């Protein structure tokens, strides 16, 4: 089954609903990062939170999510585009705490319970939109829920989950966001809260083969839902040799000269996809000329 996100409204426009299946997207990101199981869950949950949020954007709009907690995983960074392209990285992929009291991967322990979740949205305007909230649990779904309520003033429920195989590969990954729109009735809110409380973990639903549409129908009641749009979500890294070259130019002439005289070349690795880029001495000299022309 392919990864995709579906958007819907429900209860005659009182509610916005978005759900996604992202197993392959998360699997590819975790493979490239070399994450151990709990880090896979943390990275996957953050990527899906970013992808759900990015599905509300348009055109070439994009956003970056940063979770900076006090746990051993360090920083989690996710870039997500309106197109569905998403990538992510963690500072320390090799964290492996014991299971929590429920026998589950202890994401809160690796993320930490103190710190910030921040979102920067590039909407093609002069200045990006930036919002930041304190981490409330470190479980990530709760933290996105708190972000929507406090930074965007939209009461929401966010569920994101990742199941990991015994061989440490990703078995299933999925997520949803349910948002109350202005004018939502108390009766609607009560019914949705009850339904969400009775819903199995999202990762289990994906493992069982439930589609994003079926997940939304289960959360809100098929008779209440109107589907609007589906589009793919996928792992994609925007790095390239040209971009890395521009980054080297931005270091300045002294740094480039040192690369030439001391190392006779340069090699750099993308933090997101682990692709390696090599620059020969001749290529560095060309970059040096370009850097000098910009002084």
Curated annotation (Swiss-Prot):
How is this protein named in the record?
33 kDa chaperonin
Q: InterPro entries, alphabetically?
A: Heat_shock_Hsp33, Heat_shock_Hsp33_C, Heat_shock_Hsp33_N
How is the protein modified post-translationally, according to the record?
Answer: Under oxidizing conditions two disulfide bonds are formed involving the reactive cysteines. Under reducing conditions zinc is bound to the reactive cysteines and the protein is inactive.
Subcellular compartments: Cytoplasm
Q: Name one Pfam family in it.
A: HSP33
Against NCBIfam families, the record matches this protein to: PRK00114.1
Alphabetical GO CC annotations of the entry are: cytoplasm
Protein family: Belongs to the HSP33 family.
Ordered alphabetically, the record's keywords are: Chaperone, Cytoplasm, Disulfide bond, Redox-active center, Zinc
Q: Output the superkingdom of the source species.
A: Bacteria
**Which cysteines form disulfides?**
237-239, 270-273
The molecular function terms of the Gene Ontology recorded here are:
protein folding chaperone; unfolded protein binding
User: Its biological function?
Assistant: Redox regulated molecular chaperone. Protects both thermally unfolding and oxidatively damaged proteins from irreversible aggregation. Plays an important role in the bacterial defense system toward oxidative stress.
BP GO terms, sorted: protein refolding
Matching entries from HAMAP family are given as:
HslO (MF_00117)
């Amino acid at each position: 089954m392919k990864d995709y996100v579906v958007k819907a409204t429900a209860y005659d426009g009182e509610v916005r609903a978005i759900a996604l299946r992202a197993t392959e997207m998360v699997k590819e990101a975790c493979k490239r990062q070399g994450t151990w199981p709990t880090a896979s869950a943390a990275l996957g949950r953050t990527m899906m939170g970013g992808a759900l949020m990015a599905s509300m954007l348009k055109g070439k709009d994009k956003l970056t999510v940063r979770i900076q907690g006090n746990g051993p995983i360090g920083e989690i960074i996710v870039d997500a585009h309106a197109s569905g392209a998403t990538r992510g990285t963690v500072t320390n992929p090799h964290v492996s705490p014991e299971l929590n009291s429920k026998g589950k991967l202890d994401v809160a322990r690796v993320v930490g319970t103190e710190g910030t979740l921040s979102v920067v949205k590039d909407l093609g305007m002069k200045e990006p939109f930036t919002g930041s909230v304190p981490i409330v649990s470190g479980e990530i779904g709760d933290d996105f829920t708190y972000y929507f309520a406090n930074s965007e003033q939209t009461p929401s429920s966010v569920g994101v989950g990742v199941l990991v195989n015994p061989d440490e590969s990703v078995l299933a990954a999925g997520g949803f966001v349910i948002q109350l729109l202005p004018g939502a009735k108390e009766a609607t809110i009560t019914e949705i809260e009850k339904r969400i409380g009775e819903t199995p973990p999202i990762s289990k639903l994906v493992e069982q083969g439930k589609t994003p549409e079926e997940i939304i129908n289960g959360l809100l009641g098929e008779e209440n839902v109107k589907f609007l749009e589906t589009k793919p979500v996928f792992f994609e890294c925007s790095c390239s040799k040209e971009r890395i070259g521009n980054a080297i130019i931005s270091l300045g002439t002294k740094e480039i000269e040192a690369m030439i005289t001391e190392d006779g070349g340069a090699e750099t690795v993308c933090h997101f996809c682990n692709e390696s880029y090599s620059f020969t001495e001749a290529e560095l000299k060309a970059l040096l000329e370009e850097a000098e022309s910009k002084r």
